[in-house]
Amino acid sequence: MRLLIFLGLLWSLVATLLGSKWPEPVFGRLVSPGFPEKYADHQDRSWTLTAPPGYRLRLYFTHFDLELSYRCEYDFVKLSSGTKVLATLCGQESTDTEQAPGNDTFYSLGPSLKVTFHSDYSNEKPFTGFEAFYAAEDVDECRVSLGDSVPCDHYCHNYLGGYYCSCRAGYVLHQNKHTCSALCSGQVFTGRSGYLSSPEYPQPYPKLSSCTYSIRLEDGFSVILDFVESFDVETHPEAQCPYDSLKIQTDKGEHGPFCGKTLPPRIETDSHKVTITFATDESGNHTGWKIHYTSTARPCPDPTAPPNGSISPVQAIYVLKDRFSVFCKTGFELLQGSVPLKSFTAVCQKDGSWDRPMPECSIIDCGPPDDLPNGHVDYITGPEVTTYKAVIQYSCEETFYTMSSNGKYVCEADGFWTSSKGEKLPPVCEPVCGLSTHTIGGRIVGGQPAKPGDFPWQVLLLGQTTAAAGALIHDNWVLTAAHAVYEKRMAASSLNIRMGILKRLSPHYTQAWPEEIFIHEGYTHGAGFDNDIALIKLKNKVTINGSIMPVCLPRKEAASLMRTDFTGTVAGWGLTQKGLLARNLMFVDIPIADHQKCTAVYEKLYPGVRVSANMLCAGLETGGKDSCRGDSGGALVFLDNETQRWFVGGIVSWGSINCGAADQYGVYTKVINYIPWIENIISNF
């Protein structure tokens, strides 16, 4: 199907080129008079054969028998096309001076062929004459012999009865239908330098072309033209460039025309606009020209880099539109006056001045370091020195605060004080936890008064009609029992928090106010004491000192320090053996009780009450040592022998109504089970 479509299109093209009607066939047979018998004397016959335009005639002989004579003077067949004789034939075979057709084929030079037969007055022998056949055939005008001129500049396309020409990209067929003229007008060059040349340079340039080249630079530049390599433009010895010519036009005047074989001299145009025209005629075979154009402008002063800086690029001369940038050494910053710059680039103007003044490279100044709460900063490099590579040392208030890093910071090139780990924020002085002057031995119910420094984490929680306790675990977080603050969870500000006291009613204390109370989501008020744990976030951080200090949270290894019969300490202002709230902070050292035994005791005392795995029991089978009402939320603490710090292992939760009774233990929330919950609340709030 595709082939049929193609053939249809081809037929349409040929029909368009030749007209709507295909030429009638031209062919036939020619014979001598009387053939195949002998021809008579005194015979003169001629045939004029004609083919359609674009065709030629082909003729060959199948029989040829004529009288042989010197130069075929007697009998002959003459073939001629136009004014040219193609051949004069006689005899049967060719000799040195005579030609017989043999197997040769003869072609007309155009669409016409004349065949002439002549016999003289006598023949010594009977000759039978000739038989010839002819036909018209298409002429391939695109096929040329060596030395003949080509019909087309670029591409020649033959068809039946004629041909047509086409051109390569960048050329257009001239109206003469043979010459390809270059499309070389409207070329614009805007670079400060470059090359331009005649089409096809260094090959011969095309004929009948008119080229225009425009150089357009910014005002302030001046174009310089240099002819390079070779110059070959058709000329005439008696006239100035009458055939092909090159002209150069500026707003200051015209240069040229140029032709011949001598390179024209340099042309300093003193203009930023140049137009070059190149015109060619239909003759000649010349290679053309090539121009290297450059530009110049009024130079700007050589820039000098500021101290501690450099410029780029470095050039021998800077002219219009040239630019340079300034870069400072590491530790220095660009300043224009007092204004910091992210970057700096200056551009040369047409009047020979830079568009911006040179900046400075000023040493980076990180400024005074941030104050360190509960600590201080020392200048190591020198008093108040805060510039690049200066060193400062942060330190925490000894004994009560510590930091995880070494506290050394350096002023870096980005303008920030930076630690050896790349930290930009100052260190944090974290409170030291678990320091106490307490030694094991004493009791609450059956206990004794605490001394200053024994339980610096102890917190007194006062409601309008209630009192409870808590333990400071950070400078703004208090750990307590959920049941002790449950009623205050929606009105945290009504809770009165006091620290740094031993006497419950002492007027000398540190006041703290809650910001928010967090009850464990697994705690259900009035339905047992599982998950009896809560956190109180303080509005402000408290200052850590000998009277106020957090207790540590248990390490992973702490479970081994809270086994049965291991001793812990609990302190509080709860009921004493006399049934009154203690005026002084009391404490007692009590052992951990066996969990199964404790569970069995409370199943017997209070059927349905469960001692869960989130609880631990403490006390003596014989009684006498226990926490009691008013101690709720206080910390049951243990000494970590490895760190020599006290940690909270339990929170006073619940127990028998009869505090300190035999076989009735105090029950505490097991803190180690809630470390992930505690850390999550503190880190997110």
Swiss-Prot record:
Q: Which GO terms describe its molecular function?
A: calcium ion binding; calcium-dependent protein binding; complement component C4b binding; serine-type endopeptidase activity
Q: Which UniProt keywords apply?
A: Autocatalytic cleavage, Calcium, Complement pathway, Disulfide bond, EGF-like domain, Glycoprotein, Hydrolase, Hydroxylation, Immunity, Innate immunity, Metal-binding, Protease, Repeat, Secreted, Serine protease, Signal, Sushi
Family assignment?
Belongs to the peptidase S1 family.
PTM summary from the entry reads: The iron and 2-oxoglutarate dependent 3-hydroxylation of aspartate and asparagine is (R) stereospecific within EGF domains.
Domain CUB residue range list: 20-137, 184-296
Which GO terms fall under biological process for this protein?
Answer: complement activation, classical pathway; complement activation, lectin pathway; proteolysis
The tissues where this chain's protein is expressed are given as: Plasma.
Q: Which residues are reported to carry the modification (3R)-3-hydroxyasparagine?
A: N158
Q: Name one Pfam family in it.
A: Sushi
Q: Which InterPro entries match?
A: CUB_dom, EGF-like_Ca-bd_dom, EGF-like_dom, EGF_Ca-bd_CS, NOTCH1_EGF-like, Pept_S1A_C1r/C1S/mannan-bd, Peptidase_S1_PA, Peptidase_S1_PA_chymotrypsin
Localized where?
Answer: Secreted
Residues reported in the UniProt entry to bind Ca(2+) 2: D138, E141, N158, G162
- The cysteines joined by S-S bonds are C72-C90, C142-C156, C152-C165, C167-C180, C184-C211, C241-C259, C300-C348, C328-C361, C366-C411, C396-C429, C433-C552, C598-C617, C628-C659
Spell out the Gene3D superfamilies in the cross-references.
Answer: Complement Module, domain 1, Laminin, Spermadhesin, CUB domain, Trypsin-like serine proteases
Q: Does the keyword Secreted apply?
A: yes
Domain called Peptidase S1: residue spans: 444-683
Q: What else is known?
A: Dimerization and MBL2 binding requires calcium ions.
Q: Where is the active site?
A: H483 (charge relay system), D532 (charge relay system), S632 (charge relay system)
Domain called Sushi: residue spans: 298-363, 364-431
Record-given protein name:
Mannan-binding lectin serine protease 2
- Give the EC number(s) under which this enzyme is classified: 3.4.21.104
